[in-house]
Structure formats: C-alpha cells, structure tokens
C-alpha cells in the first residue's frame, strides 16, 4: 500500500516516516480554506482511486463541506457534512444525549445573542462552582478562516460574570457545565452504517494541559459497559460510518460516565489502539476499498502509550504553575508524585512510545528538533 502525506509544510512528522512514499504541502486550511481545498482537489485529480484520510477537525470539516467535488476522484470514508457537524456541536449533542438517556453534566446554555448575564449567572450558581465554560464548537469557521475556541473555568460567580461579559460578542453558544472530577475515558469505534466493526477503549492517566486535554499517557482498558452502550446509541442515532471517538468522564460522585463530546475523526492516541491490536486506519481503508474485513475479536488490555514530549510539557506545567493556576481538581497528585511518575515511566515495560520506533525513528527526531527549536 502506497501512503502519501500532506501537510502545511514540506516536511511533517508523518512525512518523515519510512512508510511515507510521497509527500506534498498545501496552504493552511485554517487561514485559507479555499486554497487548501483546491490543492487537495488538484492532488486527488492526479491520484484517482485513492482513499483520503483527513486527520484534524478543520481538514475533515473543509473536505466534507465540499465532498461532492471530490467523490468522483477519491474515496472519503466519513459521514456526510451535516451529520459530522451535528455530532461536533456539543449543544446539539447534549440535547440528543438527553433523549437517549445518556448521562451528561448539568449544563446551562448561553446563546450567542443572549444578553441576560444576570439570569445565566443565577442559573449557573444553582449548579455549583467550579464551573466549566466551553463553546459549543471547538473550531469555528469565520470569513477570515478558522479560529480555535478554548475551555475556561470559573471558580465563583464573579469569575463567571467576567467570562460572559468578555464573550458578549461570541459567534457560537456557550455551554456552562458542572465540573466532573474523574478520569477521562475514550470509546473508539469504527462503524459501517451504524453497525460496529471494531472497538477500543482507553483511560487518560496524564493530559496536556493537566486540567484536561490531549492524553499524553493513556492505558488500554476493557470498554466499560455503560460508556460503550452510550457511545453506540449516540453513533447509531447518526447512522454513523467511519471512525469516531466518544469521550466521557467517570464522575467520582456517582460512578456514572458523563458525556463530554464526539470527535468524528482519528484521535491523538491512535497508536495505542494499533499497538493493542486494533488497526483502525487499515480497517477503515479496507472498508473504503470494499475489501473483506476480518474484525479483531479483542485487544490487549493494559498496554500504555506515552507521548514523551507531551508528557514533558505536562511535567513543566506542573512544576512551574500552582494547582489553582492550572485549574486542577482538589485530588490532583502533588508535584513530587508527578515528577516520580514521570521518571518511572522510562522503565515501565507496559509503556509503549507513541512516536518513537527503533524501526522508524524519523518522526521522533523531527518532532524533537522542532520541540528544541521552539525552546531556544
């Protein structure tokens, strides 16, 4: 199988792999979405019959938005844009989850034209602090390209009021949620017309940023029955085809898995699933190519995957900032414990490297070079 890698620069992490047969660069999909799409279209026209895997929210969104212009040249094994957008919209997703009986955090919605800040604060205060403030969309398309919308925290009503006033001209609604303290759980599925082809699950041990984000140390686990059932019901509601990650948090108070979001694309810790025996990219390729699929009957539980440089960032943040500055929960491990666990990970035989491979070291050295250059 010949693999080509596209990126915003001539060289990229994946393109440095020995398994990349070709590489090309395209204009930024964030700043110039139309030029990005045209570049992909030109490449697709020269490589008809290929299977196309966009890897980020923005590239998936842009290609699905104009999918009809590509469908005669390449196969894009994802749901249509409408379903992808509906699943990515957290406000819409939570409404659907409620109808399906899927547990969710207590939430108040603040519309983008809502000026009743006093009413929102009063309602949110009934939930109790601290609160999580997040936009309904993680990436927002504007006339000038895409922007990223981040998650923030409010420890009291005054902090919440300040955040709402700062977001008075927001372009998308906000979700104001109770903060769920507990480990992050990911359910990863490949489906074909709503039917599960393959599955995997992990828990996040450490994240970047430490308050919650990208998993930098994750462990493969048996899929919890409640979380798997919830993820399946949600994706079947969308009649999903392709891969998806459904993210939950295990609420320590009631031991229920509370829905966070759906990512209708490949995820950052994908290598852990592959190392554990579920090769989602190859399975999706087989599905797209119409080949017979032999789904894995199970996977290795207990393997851990570590993104070394992301874990180093986690350590630096914990050492440089206080728990309050990082918005950490009360039971967050001490700095000493974090340092000890970081060091012990180098000799833990259950931990696999997410990027580094002796047989294919190019991606790691590329990433390390860029990491060091950013520090200098």
Regions found by a protein language model. Name each.
Residues 157, 268-287:
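Gly/Ser/Thr-rich active-site loops/lids in small-molecule metabolic enzymes
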Residues 1-79, 113-119, 342-345, 350-374:
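ATP-binding N-terminal substructure of ATP-dependent carboxylate-amine bond-forming enzymes
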Residues 175, 241-246, 294-300:
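Flexible, glycine/charged-enriched surface loops at secondary-structure junctions
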Residues 84-174, 193-195, 225, 229:
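Active-site nucleotide/adenylate-binding loops and adjacent lid/helix of ATP-dependent enzymes
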Residues 154-210, 219-232, 249-258:
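Phosphate-binding site of ATP-dependent enzymes
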Residues 286-376:
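Peripheral (often C-terminal) accessory segments that flank ATP-dependent C-N-forming ligase machineries
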Residues 236-271:
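Conserved metal-phosphate-binding beta-hairpin within the catalytic cores
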Residues 206-209, 214-216, 263-277:
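Glycine-rich phosphate/pyrophosphate-binding beta-alpha loops
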